Amino acid sequence: MSPAFNASPNQLTLALSKGRIFKETLPLLEAAGIRVMEDPETSRKLILPTSDPAVRVIIVRASDVPTYVQYGAADFGVAGKDVLMEHGMTGLYAPIDLNIARCRMSVAVPAGFDYANAVRQGARLSVATKYVQTAREHFAKKGVHVDLIKLYGSMELGPLVGLSDAIVDLVSTGGTLRANNLVEVEEIVQISSRLVVNQAALKLKRERLTPILDAFEKASAALA
């Protein structure tokens, strides 16, 4: 890590991803008296100042948030449970379910495909997903034989072009599934975003972190 980035031992760095998680984290930050001074949707900056000079926000890919926190490039961050299940929790402490960015991870298939019968018959299914580790564990527990195909987006396209029999993806309203003639057949897990903290930072910067964590916990409890 460069000395310029880690300029002050009192500096707190929060890792966030653009989009829904960023927007839904803003009220929690405001509850802690912290306001982000720039909008990542309009700014090209990846390090954003806040109203607290000792707190800054870095903008990273959602899947990279746990990595930045684990290795200490960020002291804390907000990541979906889906990301944490794939990444693992080494070096991380996840004290708070923030009750934001809620959705579910589910299995979906083309309308008309008899998923239950295929499973009963012991068919080997091809499944396209971004969440390979979680999907592998889910199907293994159910005794379903699958070939997992790693994709990074547009999961719904897999069954439409013959790449896969099914998909495992996040579902919110189900609108995208319906638009692509897919149906949700099995829920794997409910998803929400969690606050994750670097374990070393929790010890070394506890005095600075604790008021923010407490404010996040109180504000998120109101959303439950």
UniProtKB/Swiss-Prot annotation:
GO terms for molecular function: ATP binding; ATP phosphoribosyltransferase activity. CDD domains: PBP2_HisGs. Disulfide bonds: none annotated. Gene3D superfamilies: Periplasmic binding protein-like II. Pathway: Amino-acid biosynthesis; L-histidine biosynthesis; L-histidine from 5-phospho-alpha-D-ribose 1-diphosphate: step 1/9. SUPFAM superfamilies: Periplasmic binding protein-like II (SSF53850). It holds the Pfam family HisG. GO terms for cellular component: cytoplasm. NCBIfam families: hisG (TIGR00070). Belongs to the ATP phosphoribosyltransferase family. Short subfamily. Heteromultimer composed of HisG and HisZ subunits. This is ATP phosphoribosyltransferase. It comes from Cupriavidus pinatubonensis (strain JMP 134 / LMG 1197) (Cupriavidus necator (strain JMP 134)). The lineage of its organism: Bacteria, Pseudomonadati, Pseudomonadota, Betaproteobacteria, Burkholderiales. The gene is hisG.
